Amino acid sequence: CKADEMGALVRLNSFEEIAEGWQALLSSCAIDTVFFTPQWQKVWWQELGQQKEMLLLSFQPEDEITGIAPLKRENGVISFLGDRDLYDYADFLVRKGHEDSFYNALLDYLEGEPWERLELFSLSQDSCTLTHLAPLARQRGYEVEVREEDVVPGLSLPESWDAYLSSLSRKDRHELRRKLRRLSSETEYRCYTCSSPDELDQDLESFFQLMAESQEAKSRFLTPE
């Protein structure tokens, strides 16, 4: 964090005010997933943000945006935009090296707002919110509770299928090949690749339809109502 960096969070009225800078900031954040993109956040807000107050905050102490706080307020509780069902991860967007200045500015801003509880769900275990905001809040006298919410499995895939097979144990490789042979012999299946942007919308509809047919729970989830 720059020792001489000063600044305050600015509240925005729309995603359009910050969309370009938001997209540029993502590549400088510790975590960059689709859930943090302005497109994802905007669609969620437009479709599911009813009865909530948006607190979209930008931190720009110099000429570039170094932090964004995508928050909402409802019944005295401030939390991230989104919800646990549609977001694997949620967090503040903070440029690396600016964590202390951003989180101090965030606490300064929140101290001037009406709220009873700050609930930050779906943080990854290595989130800088846990390593920076939690201790800073405790220093200011806030009661902070950190709980494990859930476990998200993940795997860093190698560059090729052969490399992936090589990473498996001999037993797992044998089992995978056995299942692939069974799939080929007992069912009629095809692998589809969408290579044209013009076909994407139609292919996505087909994909969602297959998801809905695979499980009743998924069908209920994908029902517009």
Question: Model-found features: residue ranges?
Answer:
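Short, Lys/Arg-enriched N-terminal segments with co-localized hydrophobic residues
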Residues: 1-5
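A conserved beta-strand-loop-helix scaffold within acyl/acetyltransferase catalytic domains
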Residues: 7-83, 123-152, 156-225
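A gly/proline- and charged-residue-enriched helix-loop-helix capping module
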Residues: 85-115
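Conserved GNAT acetyl-CoA-binding A-motif
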Residues: 114-123
